[in-house]
Regions:
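Catalytic center-proximal scaffold of phosphoryl-transfer enzymes
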Residues: 1-312
Length: 313
């Protein structure tokens, strides 16, 4: 409330509800702190230095952590929104990567599409984590992934990442001297070029022609790469070579490998999910690990929000 000294008019305004003390940090300070530590992956000590050197404002690591906790709590409604957004999407990308929490092996799980990103940390890589996320058990769309078998229990259809196939085929060619793998790599890249030129999807005639060539390469590959080949001088049953494992997988999941040429929304790769989790690897290179599961959950929720906000701008 303020009274004008000249005319005597009294002006009143609503007191900010977030202000509860005589002196406290404003939202701009909190937002900047959270963005630097969680968005830009800057360690707490360096965030302290930034505020001290640039703003002449002392912030302790404990205060920075409290700001992150507050951001986590305020984003609880967003957490439900992103899960609903993921469930509505006809296509989602999934991936997971190792995470060090308190010196123990854990996992960061990612589910994302062109609009929404959801990260979640868990000690389990498989079903326990998927169940706790409360998304995939109810999902009915297409899942794009890197052939992690647990995902095959969810979604209605699947699409496999051909970037991974290309790398595996190159290994077969270079290390196992397989010719079929060279031909398969060339075919997959050729199909991808054709899909791009066609605007995202091939007609049924072209699909059929490519499927025949795909099957022929695999059939010839079986002669070149037999099951459990005998190794001279070695007794007992020999392990099946990696090249044959790959061949069998490409045959068994042909529909999922080639789905990108049949469904326009399905991409050639799972690169979207891989890009999403890349910053987690950067965080661990900078900071080493997460001290607690709570810290990992804060990181995941804030990163989910930042990634989603950038996509819907």
């Amino acid at each position: 409330m303020k009274e004008c000294a000249k005319c005597g008019a009294v002006t009143t305004g609503a007191y900010p509800t977030e202000v509860s003390k005589a002196v406290q940090y404003g939202n701009s300070v909190k937002v900047l702190s959270v963005y630097l530590s969680q968005g830009q992956l800057i360690p707490y000590k360096r965030v302290e230095e930034f505020f001290k050197d640039e703003l002449n404002m002392p912030l302790s690591s404990g205060t920075i952590y409290k700001f992150n906790q507050e951001a986590f709590e305020r984003l609880s409604s967003f957490d439900e929104q992103v899960k609903e957004g993921v469930l509505r999407s006809p296509l989602n990308h999934t991936d997971e990567t190792g995470l060090n929490i308190g010196g123990k092996r854990s996992w960061l799980h990612s589910i994302s599409n062109e609009t929404w990103t959801l990260f979640y940390p868990h000690t389990s890589r498989g079903k326990d984590a998927i169940a706790e996320m409360r998304v995939l058990p109810s999902y009915k769309g297409i899942l794009c992934h890197d052939y992690y078998k647990a995902y095959y229990e969810y979604g209605s259809l699947h699409a496999l990442c051909n970037s991974h196939h290309i790398r595996e085929l190159e290994r077969c060619t270079e290390q196992d001297n397989q010719n079929w793998s060279k031909l398969m790599k060339e075919l997959l890249l050729e199909i991808n070029e054709a899909v791009i030129k066609a605007g995202g999807k091939l007609d049924e005639l072209e699909q059929g022609e490519y499927q025949i060539r795909y099957g022929t390469i695999l059939s010839n590959g079986k002669d070149e790469c037999p099951l459990n080949p005998k190794i001279p001088g070695k007794r007992g049953k020999t392990a099946q070579p990696k090249s044959r494992n790959l061949l069998d997988r490409l045959e068994r999941h042909q529909e999922d490998v080639l789905r990108f040429m049949k469904v326009s929304i399905v991409p050639f790769t799972n690169n979207l999910a891989e890009r999403d989790i890349r910053m987690t690897k950067v965080h661990q290179k900078i900071s080493g690990c997460f001290r607690s599961l709570e810290g990992a959950k804060i990181f995941c929720r804030v990163r989910s929000y930042i990634s989603t906000a950038k996509r819907i701008q």
